[in-house]
Amino acid sequence: MSTKMTPPVEKNEFIDVVFEDLTHDGAGVAKVKGYPIFVKNGLPGEEAQIKIVKVKKNFAFGRLMKLHTESPYRKDAECPVYNQCGGCQLQHLTYEGQLQAKEKQVRDVMQRIGGLGDVPVHPVLGMKNPWVYRNKAQVPIGEREGGLVAGFYRQGTHDIINMESCLIQAEENDTLIQEVKRICEKHGISAYNEERNKGTLRHVMARYGQVTGEIMLVFITRTAELPNKKAIIEEIAAKFPEVKSIVQNVNPKRTNVIFGDKTTVLYGSEYIYDFIGDIKFAISARSFYQVNPEQTKVLYDKTLEYAKLDGNETVIDAYCGIGSISLFLAQKAKKVYGVEIVPEAIEDAKRNAALNNMTNAEFGVGEAEVVIPKWYKEGVIADTMVVDPPRKGCDEALLNTIIDMKPKRVVYVSCNPATLARDLKVLEEGGYKTQEVQLVDMFPHTTHVECVAWLKLV
């Protein structure tokens, strides 16, 4: 006898539902006989009519047709292209509601994935002004009716939505990009056409130093030749004295990858500079640098607090990137060792250490799970281990290395609560106890949340 279950809904069916929760990407979740239906823009507690648009074996997708009751946290999105862009997922939710939803998400995965429901999870540290916080704008360029368009891809497509401004983007970047678009149009620069693999300008990127006010402009082109380059640069430099660097990156490949291999400075310096707290950073076109420096300082201050350094410790910073956390730690530690797999990031880390006259930070290139045991054999004994892995979390070999090395304290910075909970569980099974988790809202109006946890050896 077949045990195959038939989904309790059909495509194009209209049904009334109550939303119970939000998914990790911000969709409302309703259930019919335990069968989940995901609906964009639905909020917990709301009663609504939805239309079923796709039916799968274990779940369905619906479209919100009509609200019967509204959540007290619902609001109109402030961005006119919110429903098309996809850059933000939560503008229809008040900021207070966003912070509560993120806290609930972390509490849920800590229990469900990590079995750590007893660990204190502190409310999210949000922003006083959760707008215009991004210091980097990276926009595709297209052509429409003879003119250039610059903006963002329509959700799920490569159709460019022309945008004059983005409400989460630094106004300085928005203003510059709109003017660059006008100047390029005036000088006859063509936009890259993905289908025909023709045209010149693929993307424009602007990076803004929030503290210094310095701006870097990057042209990403299909060909090395940029027509009327000299006139374009002169006009931009005259109009925007805060632009300290203009760079061209050439990407001739038919690919979705934005950057190519060749980068050339056209004007000014290879770097702009910015500060997070008292630490100065040199930022190149390709450098990884946190896009919300105000909240990055909040995150790093909490990391430093959890590391509880008194000046006598040796600290290892795994996945150290350009050394941003390492240099924060080096302010208080005796010695910091940072490791990162990307060689260019380690060059940036060394440059940033020199820029801040920090001689107690040392950096190595390679996989953390390979380099750290090598250091251990050379006599580097970490009192405190700090990890800040990518979304996939820590490599299993690194977790085993930590358990074998037995640093007294581990501080785990995470951009993915699910992999954080998974990895904390492994560390707990290896002799550690998670003490607390602090959440930081680095990306308001999106579903992303940063966490920092600390564990002690028991």
Swiss-Prot record:
Active site: 415
Residues reported to bind [4Fe-4S] cluster: 79, 85, 88, 166
One protein family per Pfam: TRAM
GO MF term list: 4 iron, 4 sulfur cluster binding; metal ion binding; rRNA (uridine-C5-)-methyltransferase activity
A GO biological process held by the record: rRNA base methylation
Domain TRAM as annotated: residue spans: 8-66
Protein family membership: Belongs to the class I-like SAM-binding methyltransferase superfamily. RNA M5U methyltransferase family.
Name of the featured protein: Uncharacterized RNA methyltransferase BA_0333/GBAA_0333/BAS0318
Organism expressing this protein natively: Bacillus anthracis
